[in-house]
UniProtKB/Swiss-Prot annotation:
ATP binds at L7, S8, G9, G10, M11, D12, S13, T14, T15, L16, L17. It comes from the Archaea. Belongs to the QueC family. Zn(2+) binds at C183, C191, C194, C197. It comes from Methanoregula boonei (strain DSM 21154 / JCM 14090 / 6A8). Disulfide bonds: none annotated. Keywords: ATP-binding, Ligase, Metal-binding, Nucleotide-binding, Zinc. One of its GO terms (molecular function) is zinc ion binding. The gene is queC. HAMAP family: QueC. Binds 1 zinc ion per subunit. This is 7-cyano-7-deazaguanine synthase.
Length: 217
């Protein structure tokens, strides 16, 4: 079965890549460079795909920095610190980002004859990111049935899982989490304070494992 995966280089999508390979999918990965501060995730995605011999496209979407400003992309906006579920984390929303990503990934999937499109939204995303909610996934799934004569199935298997659940699954699959990136601040080492870092650290604690990344003191 041919499938396309939106691969950021973070924990969730990297785990899903290993998961799909384990299930026997013939996976092609697509990564989007939208001028995010945390570009290290792109390098992680490249390294993972090279290691696993996965076809990998990187698409330049730096225009989102102009059209859809966010603290994830703008130098004049600080990435908020605190828990992932805090209201301040809404500053990290890139307006309509996943709809743009999914639309382009759908074109790629249809173009290469893949019948399945995957992305790794999970339960912890629902409160902050509108384009990770079940209702959004349902609407996009309907759109993909209508957008082309070739039927494309949108699959979001981690939609109701916590990040801790995903970490446990990934550890069982042998995911190399040292080659993933979560921190939104884009520094040499993870900050340990932004929402992405706090959720990642919680996930490893829940999974009973140590995070292999180094954090700022």
């Amino acid at each position: 079965m041919k499938a396309v995966l939106i691969l950021s280089g973070g924990m969730d999508s990297t785990t899903l890549l290993y998961d799909l390979i384990d299930q026997g999918y013939e996976v092609s990965a697509i990564t989007f460079d939208y001028h995010q501060k945390h570009k290290k995730e792109i390098a992680c995605a490249q390294k993972t795909c090279a290691k696993l011999s996965i076809p990998h496209k990187i698409v330049n979407l730096s225009v989102l920095n102009d059209l859809a400003p966010s603290s994830l992309t703008r130098a004049d906006r600080d990435v908020p610190e605190g828990h992932y579920a805090e209201e301040s984390m809404k500053q990290t929303v890139v307006p309509n980002r996943n709809m743009v990503f999914l639309s382009l990934a759908a074109s790629y999937a249809i173009g290469i004859g893949a019948g399945h499109l995957f992305y790794a939204a999970h339960a912890g995303d629902h409160a902050i990111y509108p384009d990770c909610r079940p209702v959004f996934v349902s609407a996009m799934s309907t759109a993909f049935h209508l957008c082309d004569w070739n039927d494309l199935v949108l699959q979001v298997p981690y939609l109701m899982l916590s990040k801790g659940d995903i970490a446990k699954k990934g550890i069982g699959l042998g995911v190399d989490y040292a080659n993933t990136w979560s921190c939104y601040k884009g520094k040499e080492r993870s900050c340990g304070k932004c929402g992405a870092c706090t959720e990642r650290l919680e996930a490893f604690r829940e999974a009973g494992a140590a995070d292999p990344l180094e954090y700022e003191p």
